[in-house]
Design a protein with these regions (language model features):
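Extended, small-residue-rich solenoid/repeat segments and analogous flexible loops
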Residues: 188, 202-299, 303
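Catalytic-core segments of class I nucleotidyltransferases/pyrophosphorylases
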Residues: 100-102, 109, 115-122, 135-138, ...
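An N-terminal, well-structured beta->alpha segment
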Residues: 378-431
């Protein structure tokens, strides 16, 4: 049987991790996620593979080439514009011929028994068979309700808990027949989940769901990415981690120095520098040519190629993209991400889920509660001459900026806050007061309720 890997995704929710590469090229234990999918297909004797591409296609083709080094044959089909899942597969029909074939996403992580699904599809003589997975948190996925024979009865897209009639989610892995693809229009976008499968259901054509046991994860965002890493280190998914296991829970491509603290599980690639007193793990992934400084802490975090964590810096649940660095005494909290070549300067603190886009900087000593993206942040707000923060209303200065300023100023105690009698000033004052926490019991300022607007002709703008 032939297969189609859908690898055209941009990975918007995975940013900034996916900004430099298409989503299927996201590194996972030193290799792109899509390489793990190719290994899975080969394990089930599927070696003739089409790859559909759209976003940054050349990076995929340059890395994998013909597929010969992996023992497979890859044929690429590039979309000039997005055609939907079924539309992209339609482009491959000239290569697929008149045989049934398997479709799988290039950015999922799984070890499901694809052979079992193929056999079930053939026994049912199905037009299309959906691989299903019993998910403990089904709200983020499309649910598939089947009868006792496995025939699909209906779909429920991203339900509320009141709509959860099953925990069987659509994995995006399908076995399709030419009969099913005949319903895909020759032109324009067309989607499997929104268009093709409802049409098959409406026309009462054989449409089945095959639940499989094992591991499956949609690597949709940075949190899911870290969860996949932790599950792999825990052995919950069958995956070749590509380097030797030197002791229980410790994978390392190099000998490890004395004077460091390792808490398993950890994965450490070659050409890594671990300085004395470094604390690594649990759930730490350190890619090649990385450096972890003296008494730095890296826990539940992923360091991609060529990154640095300086002395006494602390990472807990963070991701460092290639070329980025966390300088001395900086702190990156759960969900923080440094994009390619981004920098957290000395003493900077990135709070939960704060992300720096590629090339951005968190200045020394700052405390960031919001992400910095290219074009949306001209720098951290500083008090300039005369104790004034200057900026353009709605661009440099907005409610989110004042919330952050208020959260910092209110830490030391009560702070007086006034404003001019203009709508913009009142808006910023309310945001600044809101950032300071609950109102004090007595007195004003310090994060209390916003000040009343002054009478007309009151104090001039600050």
């Amino acid at each position: 049987m032939k297969a189609v890997i859908m690898a055209g995704g941009e990975g918007t929710r995975l940013r900034p991790l996916s900004l430099g590469v298409p989503k299927p090229m996201t590194p996972l234990f030193g290799r792109p996620v899509m390489e793990h999918i190719i290994t899975l297909l080969k394990r089930h004797h599927i070696t003739d593979i089409c790859v559909t591409l759209c976003y940054k296609p050349q990076s995929v083709m340059d890395y994998f080439g013909s597929g010969e080094q992996l023992g497979v044959q890859l044929t690429y089909f590039v979309e000039e514009e997005p055609l939907g899942t079924a539309g992209s597969v339609r482009n491959c029909l000239s290569h697929l011929g008149r045989e049934d074939f398997l479709v799988i996403s290039g950015d999922c992580v799984c070890d499901l028994d694809l052979t079992e699904a193929i056999q079930a599809h053939q026994e049912w003589e199905s037009c299309a068979t959906l691989v299903l997975y019993a998910h403990p948190k089904p709200l983020e996925y499309g649910l598939v309700l089947t009868d006792e024979q496995g025939r699909v009865q209906r779909f429920v897209e991203k339900p509320s808990w009141g709509q959860v009639v099953t925990n069987m989610v659509n994995t995006g892995i399908y076995i399709l027949s030419p009969r099913a693809m005949e319903l895909v229009p020759q032109q324009g976008p067309f989607d499997f989940g929104k268009d093709l499968f409802p049409t098959l259901l409406e026309q009462r054509m054989p449409l089945y769901g095959c639940p499989l046991e094992g591991y499956w994860c949609d690597m949709g965002d940075c949190g899911a990415y870290l969860k996949c890493v932790q599950d792999a280190l825990d052995g919950r998914v069958t995956m070749d981690l590509n380097i030797p296991q030197r002791s229980d829970g410790i994978w390392s491509a190099q000998s490890l120095p004395q004077g460091i603290t390792l808490t398993p599980p950890c994965w450490i690639d070659r050409d890594v520098e671990l300085e004395p007193g470094a604390i690594v793990g649990p759930y730490a992934v350190i890619s090649r040519e990385c450096r972890v400084g003296e008494r730095a802490v890296v826990q539940r975090s992923v360091l991609l190629e060529g990154t640095a964590v300086d002395s006494r810096a602390s990472l807990d649940g963070a991701i460092l993209c290639p070329g980025s660095a966390a300088q001395k005494k900086s702190i990156l909290k759960d969900g923080a991400v440094l994009g390619d070549n981004a920098l957290a300067e000395e003493g900077a603190i990135l709070l939960e889920r704060v992300r720096l886009w590629p090339g951005q900087t968190a200045p020394a000593g700052c405390r960031l509660a919001r992400s910095i993206t290219s074009g949306s942040q001209k720098g951290v707000h500083r008090f300039g001459d005369g104790g004034v923060i200057r900026g353009v209303l709605g661009e440099d200065l907005g409610p989110d900026a004042l919330l952050g300023i208020g959260s910092v100023l209110g830490v030391e105690g009560q702070v007086g806050l006034g404003c001019s009698n203009t709508p913009g000033a009142r808006m910023l004052a309310r945001a600044g007061a809101g950032g300071g926490g609950p109102p004090p019991a007595r007195g004003g300022g310090g994060g209390g309720r916003p000040p009343p607007p002054p009478p007309p002709g009151g104090a001039p703008p600050p």
